[in-house]
Regions:
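Membrane-embedded transmembrane alpha-helical bundles that form the catalytic cores
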Residues: 1-379, 383-386
């Protein structure tokens, strides 16, 4: 807006901000995505390009031979985290959300704060830098809380994550044909739990260690698998990344008002497009491979589908569910059914789907869903002591 702190900034400040962000993104792309982008270009154009480490070339005295290898790019540890924090600092200072640090040592301390450097949480400048100039404080209660965070993280990592990986997940994934379908499915669910326990365990330990040093890091996970929809999941999973993407990517893209600077009358469409772009880039941030790109795209699509689904009429939802279930059942039958039975299968599927749809409609008219919801609320209130 015209009253925002950055609206009156001189053009030089905007140029320095843009230059800083471009350098940060350039370094991230160079070290983390060089192989990925090179492979994409080679696959699309049929070329034979190879990565070339310009920093090793300079370190060798502008020579391809020497102490450093020019044909390999070594990924610095934690680069995804601390470059995001560097961008957070420059953007927050530009926006007037935080005062600049007093010296280069304070800036280096913020960027390289070791507890969260490798696995997060991602700390924004306006959350951490003011703590640099506060007196150290560690009461008995805070000490106990810090120890709890550390022990909680160790239990998640050692007792849960590592145990599942060694005794179940690795065995099934290495030889899936030796196990039943149920065991393979169970291993997939266990892998989801392992990823959560591993990641959140590390961040819990980081929060506890930082607290012992007098610093407070934001909570990074809030029981994400209790979420009821994709939107809620991303408010509970890797919360520091979600907040970063919202503040420095989704809102600058236009939020629900515009897309890439172009105003849109349909705010829902604008929000959906920007959400998808944000999740797509968020997926790529997690790793330099198509798996993460697809994963980000699926999360973005899931959020859009949920938003559309949440606004639908109940009858339309039931109709779509009927068509979906009938289609899945039909597809399953067609895999083992001769072609001449195809029309019979479709007839059965449509009949069953229509029957289920009207059963749901009848139950709704009788008010059973409302009664069940009321009973559920009373039971929850009784359990919680309300």
């Amino acid at each position: 807006s015209s009253n925002s702190p950055q609206s009156g900034r001189p053009i030089a400040a905007k140029i320095w901000l843009a230059l800083s962000v471009l350098i940060d993104l350039g370094l991230l792309c160079y070290f983390k995505y060089a192989y990925f982008f090179t492979n994409v270009v080679n696959d699309l154009l049929g070329t034979q390009f190879a990565v070339f480490d310009i920093f090793s070339y300079i370190g060798n005295g502008f020579s391809e031979s020497g102490r450093f290898m020019v044909d390999k790019i070594i990924l610095p540890v934690g680069i995804s985290f601390y470059l995001f924090q560097v961008m957070s600092y420059t953007i927050d200072v530009y926006r007037g959300h935080v005062q600049p640090v007093k010296n280069i040592l304070d800036f280096g301390f913020y960027v390289s704060f070791f507890p969260q450097l490798v696995a997060g949480p991602i700390v924004r400048a306006n959350e951490f830098i003011p703590q640099l100039y506060r007196p150290f404080r560690l009461s008995r209660r805070l000490f106990g809380l810090a120890v709890f965070w550390i022990l909680n993280g160790l239990v998640k990592k050692i007792v849960l994550s590592d145990y599942l990986a060694v005794n179940l997940i690795d065995r099934v994934f290495e030889n899936p044909l030796l196990f039943s379908g149920f065991e393979n499915l169970f291993a997939l669910f266990a892998y989801s739990l392992q990823v959560y326990a591993d990641f959140s365990g590390y961040t819990d330990i980081a929060i506890g260690i930082a607290m012992l040093m007098g610093f407070y890091l934001p909570q990074n996970f809030d029981s994400p698998y209790k979420s009821r929809n994709p939107q809620e999941f991303w408010r509970r999973w890797h919360m520091s990344l979600s907040r970063w993407l919202k503040s420095y990517l989704y809102i600058p893209l236009g939020g629900n008002r515009s897309v890439l600077g172009k105003p849109m009358k349909n705010k829902i469409a604008a929000g959906n497009v920007n959400s998808f772009i944000t999740m797509l880039l968020g997926g790529l941030w997690h790793g330099a491979s198509w798996n993460f790109v697809i994963w980000g795209a699926l999360n973005g699509a899931g959020m859009i589908v949920y938003k559309v689904w949440a606004k639908m009429n109940w009858n339309i939802k039931m109709l779509l569910m009927t068509i979906l279930m009938g289609g899945l059942w039909t597809a399953h039958q067609l895999l083992a059914t001769p072609i001449w039975n195809m029309f019979f299968v479709w007839g059965i599927a449509l009949w069953v789907g229509t029957f289920i749809r009207y059963v749901y409609w009848w139950i709704e008219r009788m008010g059973y869903f409302a009664i069940a919801g009321t009973l559920r609320a009373k039971v929850i209130g009784w359990i919680s002591g309300g």
